[in-house]
């Protein structure tokens, strides 16, 4: 389902809620929400998600965690994607990307993926299954899990969009 944000720079919980009514949720195990906009605003708002997974393509540079700390600090998992291109992209260092993430005091796991070459896909699927099982157990116990939302997000958002 594609959600139109109108003139907003990111999704909000109301938009996601309305879109979920278009789905038969009892038939789904996992719903992915891909937010829009830059790497600052989306991390600052609760969409009702249980986890934040941040994708970092090797074509974007290993410095992204340092440049966009709000997004990466909120991550429960960082996926390094398109890793099959590491053979031809000599200025991306996976270890440097992880080091930049750790500089943010993040303990989120880091996985390397290449959908094209099927590298790391089993590990990614296993992680998703573990998270799904953990969420099912939390739900059974009447608990939930809140995502890591940056507390200064609304202030930062207002400053970025001030006239």
Predicted regions and their residues:
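Canonical P-loop GTPase G-domain recognition
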Residues: 85-142
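Cofactor-binding loop segments of dinucleotide-utilizing enzymes, especially the Rossmann-like FAD-
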Residues: 5, 57-58, 115
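A short, charged, Gly/Pro-tolerant segment at domain boundaries
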Residues: 139-163
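Amphipathic alpha-helical transducer elements in NTP-driven molecular machines
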Residues: 10-13, 17, 33, 65, ...
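Nucleotide-state-sensitive switch-loop elements of NTP-binding domains
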Residues: 1-50, 72
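Conserved C-terminal guanine-recognition region of P-loop GTPase G domains, centered on the G4
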Residues: 38-108
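Conserved beta-strand scaffold positions in the cores of enzyme catalytic domains, especially
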Residues: 2, 52, 110-112
């Amino acid at each position: 389902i594609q959600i139109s944000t109108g003139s907003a720079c990111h999704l909000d919980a109301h938009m996601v809620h309305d879109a979920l009514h278009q789905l038969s949720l009892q038939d789904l195990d996992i719903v992915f929400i891909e937010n829009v906009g830059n790497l600052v605003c989306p991390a600052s708002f609760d969409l009702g998600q249980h986890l934040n997974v941040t994708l970092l393509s090797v074509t974007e540079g290993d410095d992204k965690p340092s440049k966009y700390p709000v997004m990466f600090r909120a991550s429960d998992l960082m996926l390094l994607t398109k890793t099959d291109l590491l053979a031809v992209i000599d200025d991306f260092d996976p270890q440097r990307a992880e080091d930049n993430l750790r500089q943010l005091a993040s303990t989120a796991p880091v996985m390397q993926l290449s959908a094209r070459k099927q590298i790391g896909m089993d590990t990614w699927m296993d992680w998703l299954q573990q998270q799904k099982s953990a969420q099912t157990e939390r739900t059974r116990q009447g608990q939930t899990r809140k995502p890591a939302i940056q507390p200064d997000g609304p202030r930062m958002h207002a400053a970025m969009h001030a006239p």
